[in-house]
A protein has these predicted regions:
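Conserved, structured C-terminal
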Residues: 1-152
Length: 152
């Protein structure tokens, strides 16, 4: 199961850590897949105005700028130069793995407006370990992004 966990993170697939009861299809980048015509699971939440605002959390990928550093699940994202407190908390890292294909640590997590911030660098702060790691916001798809290997 560990290999499957790494592969799902490399491909950007949401699983238990990303589906915690606080997230919607919109947060996962799947909002357009929710039917507007027929009732379905997630339909009611997808119509709530507050959950469809521009500044909601979006599932994205994270790469450490120093490829020798390991990402830590549970770290919180703070903009560089900002004080590390709840007021400046932008989101959290939900899943991490070492990618044997990319040869470095990768992570999935939620950050405000994440899908509009690819390439931006933020701090992944873990107060319990007293660690601050600079990470780059990335597409949640790390490997075979176009699906060429999948489809041959």
């Amino acid at each position: 199961t560990e290999a499957l966990g790494v592969m799902r993170i490399e491909k950007g697939h949401a699983a238990g850590n990303e589906l915690n009861g606080q997230t919607t299809a919109n947060n996962l980048g799947l909002g357009k897949m929710v039917s507007k015509l027929n009732d379905c699971i997630g339909n009611t939440m997808s119509e709530r105005e507050e959950l469809n605002k521009e500044n909601t959390l979006k599932l994205v990928g994270f790469i450490p700028t120093n490829k020798n550093q390991s990402l830590v699940a549970g770290s919180h994202f703070i903009e560089k130069g900002k004080t590390e407190n709840l007021e400046n908390d932008q989101g959290w890292m939900s899943s991490v793995a070492f990618s044997p294909m990319l040869k470095h640590s990768i992570g999935l997590g939620y950050i405000i407006r994440g899908n509009q911030r690819y390439g931006e660098k933020v701090h992944a702060v873990n107060p319990l370990r007293k660690e601050i790691i600079e990470v780059e916001i990335h597409s949640p798809h790390f490997y075979d992004t176009e699906g060429e290997l999948l489809r041959g």
